[in-house]
C-alpha cells in the first residue's frame, strides 16, 4: 500500500523516471491503484505535465498488460508540448479509445486548438477515420411540384398555380464546427502560429471542409475576422464557389474590421478577389447593408465593370438609399432624372418620396427627340398597400408635372384609379380624380370604378366598407357619363347574386342620387321602386338650381365650368354662403365646393407672396396671374 501511494504521488507531481517507476513496481506498487479516482497513469498524463516521458508511460502500461490503457487521457496528452507520434501509434495499436467525445469535441478537433499542431499527428488521427466534424448537421432544400388537376396543369393567366412543397435534406449543405474551424479561430491567441502546411493538409484531406458553415458562415469568414491576415492563408481558405451572399458577408466583415482594430489596413488584393466576377446583385445588397460611405466607396473603387450599369441595376432591383447613389455618382456614374425614376418604380416596394425627390432634383435630362424619355410612368406604383398610401401620395405630388398618362391602363384594362379604389386608398383616389383621372374607364371584364366600389363596399367589414362608400361618393360626385352609368347598372343587374349583405340598398341609393343628375329619365326607368327617394333628392337639386350668381346656378358652376372660370365664382359671397349649407343627400358636392374655396385661397396667398415689386409676375394683370395659378393648382 505504501509503495502504491508513493508511485501515485510521484506520478502526480511528475517527479518520476522509468528507473524509479520500475523499482516501485518491482517492490509491489500497483499501477492500477486509484487515489481520488485516479490511477498513476491518469495523474501523470495531463497537459500540465510539460515533460511526459514515453518510457514512464510505456512502463505503467506494459507492467499490467495495457489494462489501464484508457486511463491514458489522450485529450490531455494532445494538449501537451511534447507529443511523440510513435507513442501515439503504439497506443492506437494497443486499442486506446480514440473516437470518444469530450466537452463536445473529438480528439482531432481538440488537437486543432493547441498552439502548434503537427501535420503528421493530424494525418495519423485522420487516417484512423476520426471525423473532421464531430457534430455535423445538414440543411434542407425545398422540392416544388406543380399540382395536376384533371390530367392537366391547373393554370390561369397571371395567376399563381397550385404547388406542393416538400422539404428534403440537402447533404451538400453541411453545417458544424470542423477541425479547420477550430484551428483558425484559436490562431488569434498569443503564441498560436498559423501554418499554411496545416491548412493545406486539412483541406487536401477533405476538400469539402471549406464549405462547412457554422452560424451560416464559412471558416474564411472567421479567419478574416479573428486573425492577422496573410494572403497565402486567405488563398488557401478562399474558394470562388462560395455563395455570393457568403462572399459579401466575408467582404463586409473584412472591411468593417478597420473600425474594430487599430492599424488594420485594407488589402486591395483581398477585396479584388472577393469582388471578382461576382453577381452584382450581391454586391449591391452589400452596399445597402454597410450604410457607411467609406466602405461603400472602397467597394465601388475596386469594381471593374461599368459603374453606370451598376447604378441602373441598383435603382431597378434593390431597395434604394440616397447615400449609395451619391457614392456611385462620386465614382463616375451619371444619374438620369426620368430614366432612373422609371426604373426605380419597377421594383415592388420602392416607394420612398425622399429618394424620388433626390432623383428629380439631381438627375440629368436626356436631350433627344424622344419625349417619352422625359416622362414618368407611375403605373408600376399600383396597386399599393394602404400602409404606403401617404408615401405614394407624396410621390405623385412630386411627379405630377412629369406624369406621362394618369389614365394609363394595364393589360386587364384596369386604370391607376381602379387599382387605388380596390385598395380603398381614399386620399389617392381623391388626388387622382382632382388631377384628371378618368372615372369612366371600363375594364376588360366589364367593371367600372362605380361597380367595384359597390361590390367591395357590400362585401367588406363595416370599417372597410365605410372607406369604399366614401370613395363611391367621391367618384359619383364628379358625375360619370351616361355610358358608364349604363354599364354599371347592367353589370349590377346581371350579378344580383353578388349582393347578399344588407348594405346593397343604401349603396344603390348613393348611385341613384347622382345618376339622376346625369339622366333623370333613365334612372327612374331602371329604379322605379326608388321614385320616392328620387323625389326627396330632387328637392335638394332644385335648391342648387335656384341659387344663382349672375344667372349661373350652383350645379352649373360645379359641373359645367372649367377650372379658371370656376375661380371667378368661388370667392363670391353667394357661393361661399351656399358652401356652408348642409344637405341630406348631396353633402359631397358641398365638400367639393369648400375644396374649391380652399384651393382658391391658396392661389391668392401664393400670388400675393410671389408678386413682389419689380418682378415680372407683379407686372401682369391680376386676372392673368389668377389664370396662371388656376391652371397650375386648381
Curated annotation (Swiss-Prot):
This is Ankyrin repeat protein OPG025. Pfam families: Ank_4. InterPro entries: Ank_repeat_dom-contain_49, Ankyrin_rpt, Ankyrin_rpt-contain_sf, Pumilio_RNA-bd_rpt. SMART domains: ANK (SM00248), Pumilio (SM00025). Induction: Expressed in the early phase of the viral replicative cycle. PANTHER family: CYCLIN-DEPENDENT KINASE INHIBITOR 2C-RELATED, POLY [ADP-RIBOSE] POLYMERASE TANKYRASE. Interacts with components of host SCF complex CUL1 and SKP1 and components of the cullin deneddylation/COP9 signalosome complex subunits COPS7A and COPS7B. One of its GO terms (biological process) is symbiont-mediated suppression of host innate immune response. Keywords: ANK repeat, Early protein, Host-virus interaction, Inhibition of host innate immune response by virus, Repeat, Viral immunoevasion. It comes from the Viruses. Plays a role in the inhibition of host immune repsonse by counteracting the action of interferons on early events in the viral replication cycle. PROSITE patterns: ANK_REP_REGION, ANK_REPEAT. GO terms for molecular function: RNA binding. ANK repeats lie at residues 36-69, 70-100, 103-134, 175-211, 307-337, 412-441. Belongs to the orthopoxvirus OPG025 family.
Amino acid at each position: 500500500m505504501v509503495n502504491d501511494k508513493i508511485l501515485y504521488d510521484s506520478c502526480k507531481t511528475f517527479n518520476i523516471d522509468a528507473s524509479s517507476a520500475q523499482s516501485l513496481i518491482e517492490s509491489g506498487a500497483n499501477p492500477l491503484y486509484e487515489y481520488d479516482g485516479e490511477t498513476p497513469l491518469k495523474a501523470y498524463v495531463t497537459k500540465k505535465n510539460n515533460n511526459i516521458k514515453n518510457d514512464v508511460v510505456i512502463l505503467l502500461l506494459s507492467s499490467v498488460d495495457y489494462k489501464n490503457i484508457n486511463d491514458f487521457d489522450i485529450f490531455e496528452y494532445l494538449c501537451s508540448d511534447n507529443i511523440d507520434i510513435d507513442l501515439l501509434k503504439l497506443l492506437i495499436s494497443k486499442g486506446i479509445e480514440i473516437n470518444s467525445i469530450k466537452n463536445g469535441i473529438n480528439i482531432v478537433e481538440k488537437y486543432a486548438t493547441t498552439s502548434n499542431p503537427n501535420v503528421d499527428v493530424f494525418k495519423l488521427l485522420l487516417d484512423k477515420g476520426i471525423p473532421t466534424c464531430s457534430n455535423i448537421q445538414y440543411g434542407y432544400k425545398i422540392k416544388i411540384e406543380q399540382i395536376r388537376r384533371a390530367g392537366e396543369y391547373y393554370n390561369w393567366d397571371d395567376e399563381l398555380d397550385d404547388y406542393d412543397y416538400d422539404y428534403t435534406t440537402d447533404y451538400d449543405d453541411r453545417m458544424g464546427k470542423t477541425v479547420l474551424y477550430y484551428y483558425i479561430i484559436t490562431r488569434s491567441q498569443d503564441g498560436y502560429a498559423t501554418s499554411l502546411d496545416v491548412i493545406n493538409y486539412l483541406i487536401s484531406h477533405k476538400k469539402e471542409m471549406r464549405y462547412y458553415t457554422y452560424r451560416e458562415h464559412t471558416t474564411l469568414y472567421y479567419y478574416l475576422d479573428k486573425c492577422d491576415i496573410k494572403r497565402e492563408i486567405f488563398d488557401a481558405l478562399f474558394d470562388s464557389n462560395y455563395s455570393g451572399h457568403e462572399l459579401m458577408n466575408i467582404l463586409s466583415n473584412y472591411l468593417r474590421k478597420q473600425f474594430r482594430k487599430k492599424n488594420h489596413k485594407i488589402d486591395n488584393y483581398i477585396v479584388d478577389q472577393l469582388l471578382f466576377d461576382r453577381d452584382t446583385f450581391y454586391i449591391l445588397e452589400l452596399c445597402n447593408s454597410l450604410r457607411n460611405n467609406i466602405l461603400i466607396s472602397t467597394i465601388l473603387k475596386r469594381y471593374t465593370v461599368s459603374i453606370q450599369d451598376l447604378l441602373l441595376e441598383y435603382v431597378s432591383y434593390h431597395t434604394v438609399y440616397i447615400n449609395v447613389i451619391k457614392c456611385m455618382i462620386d465614382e463616375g456614374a451619371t444619374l438620369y432624372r426620368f430614366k432612373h425614376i422609371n426604373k426605380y418604380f419597377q421594383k415592388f416596394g420602392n416607394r420612398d418620396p425622399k429618394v424620388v425627390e433626390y432623383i428629380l432634383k439631381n438627375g440629368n435630362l436626356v436631350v433627344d427627340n424622344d419625349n417619352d424619355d422625359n416622362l414618368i410612368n407611375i403605373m408600376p406604383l399600383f396597386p399599393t398597400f394602404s400602409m404606403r398610401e401617404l408615401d405614394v401620395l407624396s410621390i405623385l405630388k412630386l411627379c405630377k408635372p412629369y406624369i406621362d398618362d394618369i389614365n394609363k391602363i394595364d393589360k386587364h384594362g384596369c386604370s391607376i384609379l381602379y387599382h387605388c379604389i380596390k385598395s380603398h386608398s381614399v386620399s389617392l383616389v381623391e388626388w387622382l380624380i382632382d388631377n384628371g383621372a378618368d372615372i369612366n374607364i371600363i375594364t376588360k371584364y366589364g367593371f367600372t370604378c362605380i361597380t367595384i366600389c359597390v361590390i367591395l363596399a357590400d362585401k367588406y367589414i363595416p370599417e372597410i366598407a365605410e372607406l369604399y362608400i366614401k370613395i363611391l361618393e367621391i367618384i359619383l360626385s364628379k358625375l360619370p357619363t351616361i355610358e358608364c352609368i349604363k354599364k354599371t347598372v347592367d353589370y349590377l343587374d346581371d350579378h344580383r347574386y353578388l349582393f347578399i349583405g344588407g348594405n346593397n340598398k343604401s349603396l344603390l341609393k348613393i348611385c341613384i342620387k347622382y345618376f339622376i343628375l346625369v339622366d333623370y329619365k333613365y334612372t327612374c326607368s331602371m329604379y322605379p321602386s326608388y321614385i320616392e327617394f328620387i323625389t326627396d333628392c330632387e328637392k335638394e337639386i332644385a335648391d342648387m338650381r335656384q341659387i344663382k350668381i349672375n344667372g349661373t346656378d350652383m350645379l352649373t358652376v360645379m359641373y359645367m365650368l372649367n377650372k379658371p372660370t370656376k375661380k371667378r365664382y368661388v370667392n363670391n359671397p353667394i357661393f361661399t354662403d351656399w358652401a356652408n349649407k348642409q344637405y341630406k343627400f348631396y353633402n359631397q358636392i358641398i365638400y367639393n365646393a369648400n375644396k374649391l374655396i380652399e384651393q382658391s385661397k391658396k392661389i391668392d396667398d401664393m400670388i400675393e407672396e410671389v408678386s413682389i415689386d419689380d418682378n415680372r409676375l407683379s407686372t401682369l394683370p391680376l386676372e392673368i396671374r389668377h389664370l396662371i395659378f388656376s391652371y397650375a393648382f386648381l
